[in-house]
Swiss-Prot record:
UniProt-recorded name of the protein: UPF0758 protein SPy_1118/M5005_Spy0840
GO biological process: proteolysis
Coiled-coil annotated spans: none
Pfam family for this entry, one: UPF0758_N
GO molecular function: metal ion binding; metallopeptidase activity
Keywords: Hydrolase, Metal-binding, Metalloprotease, Protease, Zinc
Origin species: Streptococcus pyogenes serotype M1
Alphabetized NCBIfam families for the sequence: PRK00024.1, radc
Domain of life: Bacteria
Record: residues binding Zn(2+): 174, 176, 187
PANTHER family: DNA REPAIR PROTEIN RADC, UPF0758 PROTEIN YEES-RELATED
Motif JAMM motif boundaries: 174-187
Family of this protein: Belongs to the UPF0758 family.
Amino acid sequence: MYSIKCDDNKAMPRERLMRLGAESLSNQELLAILLRTGNKEKHVLELSSYLLSHLDSLADFKKMSLQELQHLAGIGKVKAIEIKAMIELVSRILATDKTLTDSVLTSVQVAEKMMAALGDKKQEHLVVLYLDNQNRIIEEKTIFIGTVRRSLAEPREILYYACKNMATSLIVIHNHPSGNIEPSSNDYCFTEKIKRSCEDLGIICLDHIIVSYKDYYSFREKSTLF
């Protein structure tokens, strides 16, 4: 469980933030500022402690649905919505901070960006980065969002945008909602197929990366396909 310390002698979080800066506040205090008020049973600091004590880590916030958050904290719909909005805003800030504006250098560089973007998705997403001859991103394209009837994508869909963008190379990324990053037999077949199709058109498939919310698998780093 997430460890919480509650010190009743501390000044209220807003005053501490003004005096010491946001970086000096605990997670409990920062959450209390977002909650603003407690409920009938708990003071706002107690309520934030209660919520955090039910999490293994702060990353669990992102995986919780609006209904789960509202039920767990007993904070009502409005506060739950505000927390979810804050989480999404933070995710977008992090994604922007990790945007690959220059050259793509390593698989881990791509994986970190896509773990933040796709790690918490409940459905399988397939994203392709199309690169120029200096490994700069021309376009980041979501090719499909998976359903029970369909898994991954056909090479023609991926190559259509490669030709449209006059891409020299590409990187394929998809997530495993289960959290297990080990590639399936279908993942291997798909990787071989897209790599072969790229070669037929003179386009380089640099990597196929599988991501979860906390880890990744790179076919270039760990398989013999590249």
